[in-house]
Amino acid sequence: MDSANKNTKIFAEQLGNDFTISVDDEDMEMEYPLRSSTPTKVIDDQREILLQKASRISKLDEALCELNNESNGSIDLSIDSFIPSYDEFLHKKLLNEDTGHESKVSDQVKQVISTPMSTCFEQWFEGEEQSSTGNNQDISYSSVNSLSPKRRGISLMSIDANKLSPKKTSPNSGYITSPLRHPILLSETEPGTPTKNDSPAYIGLPSQPNSITTLNNTNQKFQVPDNDKPPMSSLNELSASYKPIVFDSSQHKTQGTDNNDSFYHDDTNCIHLSRLEKIRELLTFVQLELKYYVEPLKKELQETKTLLAQKEEEISNLKDKLQNAGLS
């Protein structure tokens, strides 16, 4: 019993930092009387709660550290070393030069970003379910070295927004074509039906007055003078010589490359999108954790403001009473 009256200190070590929390037995006695519960059970429950809080604080600190490293571009990983080589490879590909190191660079890119970035943060969002076991190895995120974002982080400063090309709507649609509209020949119009081609405004002839138009038969077709009508042979030659405009990208491609590769953006193996996905998940985690800590503080601040307003009102009433009594 005498030892139960002393202060009990619990030490939780997370990520190499000493995190010390002291718990007074007097508070535990108010919540859990010693006669109704054993002291060992009380201490175990308190230790589990404190370890959960320490784990959340350490994970939040690590996430903030990761965001700071991303903003400074100070993460030193192998992916940063061959980003210039990959850009050089793309430049040579456009110039139709030798690309012998294509497979080597592509394999390096796929090896680094083959695993989705979300796997780095799966344990961050598991909450208290995993931390309730009380095992320090399960609680500490840094113990999972294979999934640590520090091993797979990408510096933010190496992003070049100008190199992010838009994605093609349909990779299997082939060449991008922009066909011209087929010219309409005068001979293709049905007799007796006025069209845009043989109307006076279209041909350039002055339109007839309304009085003359009403006198003519509605089925009568406007006739174009023979000397103003272009010869039919020239129109047929123009129609026969028409060819749709086709974009030829063969000069920008190397041998053995699919024709559709240069027209769409590869979202799966894009190192820039992977980096942005990592930053998005980091920001989401930090936002949720800060909300966990900020919401109680906001509530406490609102209650304090309400209490302060009540005290100010009481002080104002006392001043009025003193003034009415002539003591002010």
Swiss-Prot record:
Residue numbers carrying Phosphoserine: S170
Annotated protein name in UniProt: Uncharacterized protein C9.11
Annotated keywords: Cytoplasm, Nucleus, Phosphoprotein
UniProt source species: Schizosaccharomyces pombe (strain 972 / ATCC 24843) (Fission yeast)
Cell compartment(s), UniProt: Cytoplasm; Nucleus
GO cellular component terms, semicolon-separated: cytosol; nucleus
